[in-house]
Each structure stands twice: as structure tokens, then as C-alpha cells.
A protein has these predicted regions:
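Acidic (Asp/Glu)-rich catalytic clusters
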Residues: 7, 33-36, 55-67, 86-95, ...
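Short, acidic/polar
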Residues: 22-35, 78-93, 111, 135-140, ...
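A structural motif
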Residues: 39, 94-97, 125, 149
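Glycine/small-residue-rich loop that forms an oxyanion/phosphate-binding "nest" at active or ligand-binding sites
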Residues: 72-118
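Acidic-and-aromatic substrate-binding clefts and catalytic sites of carbohydrate-active enzymes
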Residues: 22-25, 45-53, 75-80, 105-109, ...
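Beta/alpha (TIM)-barrel catalytic core signal, keyed to glycine-rich beta->alpha loops juxtaposed to Asp/Glu
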Residues: 104-191
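N-terminal binding-site loop/beta-alpha segment at the start of enzyme catalytic domains
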Residues: 1-68, 182-183
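Conserved, mostly hydrophobic/aromatic
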Residues: 17, 34, 42, 54, ...
Length: 191
């Protein structure tokens, strides 16, 4: 397994399993299989409605929590909910999240980011980041943040390489993480 060190010193696996569009039963089965196959990064989100299943899968895997890199995302409707992160921890049945992202730059995402900073300072979250943000939106976060974001998760694949965005992230000490890294499973790309 390869790792990358984030700007706060946390080591993140470079590969893992995402649970987008998986039903809870599918997510639980897929995560257990992935963990048994050596994958250690699990990506989920409030909006995927399968966080409880991911939590069950982590327990069923037999792995220690420290062996798993758990990543989830805070949905915009929860940005102002003072206990949103505690509710996320409860759904996942865990004491901490390795990487928590703002899912989208919608609504009051600054309030959401502030909540994540608080959770980071309290030790509930090991790293915080962003998802689906453009450069202008990230600049707004950089102008207010006390804790620098570590990761931007966004659509990146051979058909959408984002060289300007990658250069911006590198200059700011952030890592890019791809969703749909195989281009939506495009047959021409895969073959």
C-alpha cells in the first residue's frame, strides 16, 4: 500500500474504496471485501446514506480502527448543525474520522468549515478538506481558515486532468484526490 503525507503530517493511503451509489447492504459487503483484500481507505458521505453500513463493515472486518483510513463528507444542510459531526461519528460508530470534507461549496460552507476546524482541534477529526471546490471557492476558505485544508476531492481522470487546479493545490500544500478516477468507467478508457 502506498501513502501520501498530508500537510498536517497524517498519512493517507493513495487508493481505497468509494461507496457512492451503493445501498447500505452493498456498501457493507463491498467495504468488508475491500478491507479483507488489503484496501484501507474508505470514502463515504452523509449524502450517500450508507455511513451506518460502513461502520458495521469496519467492525465486521476484524481490523483495528487504526488500520483503517475513514473519510466522509459533511452535507450542506448540516453546515450550521452544531452536533452534525457528533451525529456523523455516531452513524459511523467510531470515535474519530481520519479525513472529513465539506461535500460541496453550497450554502454556508464557511460555517461548515468552522465546525470541521473545531472537531479537528477536539481530536474528533485527524484531517479536514474540501470536495468539489474551484480555486475561487478555495481562496475564500484560505482567507478565513485557522486549520489549512489538506485535501481537495474532485473529478479527475484522463478526460478531465485539471492541470491548473493541480498546480494551485501543490502551491498551497494540498493533495488532490480523484472521484471517478476511471472516468465514469468509460469503456474506451478501460479497454
Amino acid at each position: 500500500m502506498e501513502y501520501i503525507t498530508l500537510n498536517n503530517g497524517v498519512k493517507m493511503p493513495t487508493e481505497g474504496i468509494g461507496t457512492f451509489l451503493l445501498t447500505p447492504d452493498e456498501a457493507e459487503s463491498a467495504v468488508v471485501s475491500a478491507l479483507h483484500s488489503g484496501a484501507t481507505l474508505i470514502d463515504t458521505a452523509n449524502a450517500y446514506v450508507n455511513e451506518k453500513a460502513v461502520g458495521r463493515a469496519m467492525k465486521a472486518s476484524g481490523l483495528q480502527r487504526e488500520e483503517i483510513f475513514l473519510e466522509t463528507k459533511l452535507w450542506p444542510s448540516f453546515y450550521k448543525d452544531a452536533d452534525a459531526i457528533d451525529k456523523t461519528l455516531a452513524r459511523l460508530d467510531t470515535d474519530y474520522i481520519d479525513l472529513l470534507l465539506i461535500h460541496q461549496p453550497a450554502g454556508d460552507y464557511v460555517a461548515g468549515y468552522r465546525q470541521m476546524e473545531k472537531a479537528y482541534k477536539e481530536g474528533k477529526v485527524r484531517a479536514i478538506g474540501l470536495s468539489n471546490f474551484n480555486i475561487k471557492q478555495m481562496e475564500k476558505i484560505f482567507s478565513i481558515c485557522e486549520v489549512q485544508p489538506t485535501v481537495l476531492q474532485t473529478e479527475v481522470h484522463p478526460y478531465n486532468q485539471e492541470p491548473e487546479l493541480k498546480a494551485y493545490l501543490k502551491a498551497h500544500g494540498m493533495v488532490i484526490q480523484a472521484w471517478y478516477p476511471l472516468g465514469h468507467a468509460d469503456k474506451a478508457l478501460l479497454n
